[in-house]
């Protein structure tokens, strides 16, 4: 069932999203060689609580961390450990803020620099995903369909990358994961995919591999 939010609920989610955006920006800018995944997790939790939110992922039964962290060949949903990140690592952080009964969900990925060297293949990989993601987000509007979003993300396949089809974006609100599912590939004809309506709230996620 797809939940349509009220204007007040939208304002609450917007505030939670602003907190999450600020937290994730600080976290990603703070990641450096030698930090452990658990230290990154602790930083995210501290910042969320300082801003008046709660770690949304900790409300998932059985999950005890603020973030999921995915390094290099981990796709998504990696659990923070004592592993230290190093130069050249691709580090993805997925995080959620819970505020006044509503969830938000956001992820960001960075490439830890190799000093004076560059890694053009990884930089190209990350740019392709970010460009496709923003093109997809621009399609989230009343009257469009989920397929309009999915096909934009699937465009990374034209660059030789592959979409992970077992993991998808989703609605978000009172629950962290709500309908509709938003795959990064065209799972059905666009006209048969769910219709976006005003005051729907979704998490658009591009999940893809280099190979």
Task: Please state what every model-predicted region is.
Residues 1-211:
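Active-site neighborhoods and metal-handling regions in enzymes and metal-associated proteins
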């Amino acid at each position: 069932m797809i939940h349509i939010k009220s204007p007040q609920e939208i304002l609450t989610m917007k505030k939670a999203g602003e907190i999450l955006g600020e937290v994730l920006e600080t976290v990603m800018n703070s990641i450096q060689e030698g930090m452990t995944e658990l230290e990154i997790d602790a930083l995210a939790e501290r910042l969320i609580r300082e801003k008046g939110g709660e770690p949304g992922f900790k409300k998932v039964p059985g999950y005890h961390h603020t973030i999921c962290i995915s390094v290099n060949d981990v796709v998504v949903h990696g659990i923070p450990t004592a592993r230290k990140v190093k130069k050249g690592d691709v580090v993805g952080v997925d995080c959620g803020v819970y505020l006044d009964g509503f969830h938000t969900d956001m992820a960001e990925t960075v490439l830890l620099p190799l000093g004076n060297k560059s890694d053009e293949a990884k930089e190209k990989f990350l740019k392709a995903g970010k460009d496709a993601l923003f093109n997809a987000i621009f399609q989230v509007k009343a009257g469009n369909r989920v397929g309009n979003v999915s096909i934009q993300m699937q465009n990374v396949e034209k660059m030789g990358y592959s979409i992970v089809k077992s993991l998808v974006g989703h609605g978000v609100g009172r629950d962290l994961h709500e309908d509709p599912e938003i795959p990064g590939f065209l799972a059905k004809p666009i006209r048969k995919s769910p219709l976006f309506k005003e005051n729907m709230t979704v998490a658009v996620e591009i999940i893809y591999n280099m190979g």
